[in-house]
Amino acid sequence: MGFKTGDFPPVDVDTFLDKPLFERTKALALHWVQFGFGSPKMIPTTYVLKLVFLYLLAGTALITWTSGVGPFWDVAGWWNEPVVYQKLVLWTVLLEAIGLAGSWGPIAGKFKPMTGGVLFWARPGTIRLRPWKAVPGTGGDTRTVFDVVIYLGFLASLLLAIVLPGVPSESLSAVLPDNTSGLVAPWLMIAPVVLLVLCGLRDKTIFLASRGEQYLPAMVFFGVLPFVDMIVAAKLLICAVWIGAGVSKFGRHFTNVIPPMISNSPCVPSKWLKRAHYRDFPRDIRPSRFATFMAHVGGTTVEIITPLVLLFSTNYWLTLAGVVLMVVFHLFITSTFPLAVPLEWNLLFGYLAVFLFLGFPNQDGFGIADMSSPVLTVAIIAALAFFPALGNLRPDLVSFLPSMRQYAGNWASALWTFTPGAEEKLNTISPRPSRNQVDQLQALGYPAAVAEITMQQTIAWRSMHSQGRGLFSVLAARLDDLDRRTVREAEFACNSLIGFNFGEGHLHGLDLIEAVQKRVGFAPGEFVVCWVESQAIHSKVQHYQLIDAALGVIERGHWTVADAVNEQPWLPNGPIPLTVTWRAPQPAGETAPGQPVAP
């Protein structure tokens, strides 16, 4: 891998696309094992520069300058200042909400332009996705001037809270009498909380992009709780995120996440170490025992045990060890450059571990028992546990982000398929700030075949995860022309249509397909999607839908997760067993070329 030259798959560009789909998938999956996406070093370098100059330097300079805590380079002077903590959270929310943090740039499928977010959400006429149809005043799927106004108002309210100096707080002075920087004025939290909720009720994309499931509770704590309660509540919040993520890794999915993530890391140059995460490369690229150890000892165990230690420890050295472990944990994730690129989030959580548990240790009056009311403690714990519990029991009702299933591998997912030339119709959607990814790559100077092979690497990546084997199985069993179709990873395709995705299949489900169909008008069979819901924690199956954009849902069914994870990504034994629970009536003899066919 060079600085400007990537590791492109070693295939014949002129003939590769003529091969059967699963032959292509196998070649690209095997290439992924050793090279990941094969991105040139320039791309991760771009992300590092964004982290250093925009997030860290610009952010801390603005925050320290407006808070009166000394120059930004004097980290020892401000790292444990409460107002800095508050403003750094708000700064992170601001960048997320603009689209300059997670799901940014080429790793997330944004090539030209590299930003989604604000380009979509500050523009009337773009697609929006309401979370609940029953909420009055949220009808439709088109962004209005009102939507743009409340979104821009949300951004402005965050910026205002960041730039205004802190105000004195009696509850803070009672604990830290020498503090002079104060806290963010509680009334400044009213507007961002209200506007984020309004934005979310009108368009779930903005709420999820702003990481509302984590930052909205924090902003509520900033606005209504006295200082000690605020710190303890923040500890409960971060531990809920960690533990929820750890619990979500139980099961068969997460082990499949680690190998392709390590393979894509520019910080793991050793090919043998990457191959060590697979059973018997190139014959068997299911996860190895080493990958299982990394997943469930380095991941699941750390995310559950360490937060509990931090939450209850009153020993400095034990707390220090826990903090160091969580900082290393988040730095490791950052170094792998996951496809959703939540880099700012990981750096923030590393800082929060230091600030909350070393800056305000339990033994100094900031433990759970030090909250002003046990009723308040129980209420906060119950509120923080509600959506993770509901989302794991009923994943169809709750996004995987409020369910705290980050990195779990248990995600709602989809593959989109188009008949030859049909994908180009997506480019007729207007307004739409970006074109299809293959067109973005060609606009950067890549030949059409190279652009297409690059995008097919993303479906090979999907095939290396548990859902991929099931999705490909449904498509192979139901589409007799699959080899001729253009197949897309829905997470990437979604990014070009609504400006954001974070591995969240609920953003590219039936609602988005219906919105696209209303604008494009695909013929039956032209645009067929296989979409699957996350696995419920008490279930052994995943439920899928086969969707024809012109006809709606045409089949529902499920597959057993064990069958999916036991197969190779390229399905050498054919589709895994599928159980059909419903199929739309289909008049005899009326199957059009390229339309789904009954088994």
Question: Each predicted region: which residue ranges?
Answer:
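Alpha-helical membrane-anchoring segments
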Residues: 1-599
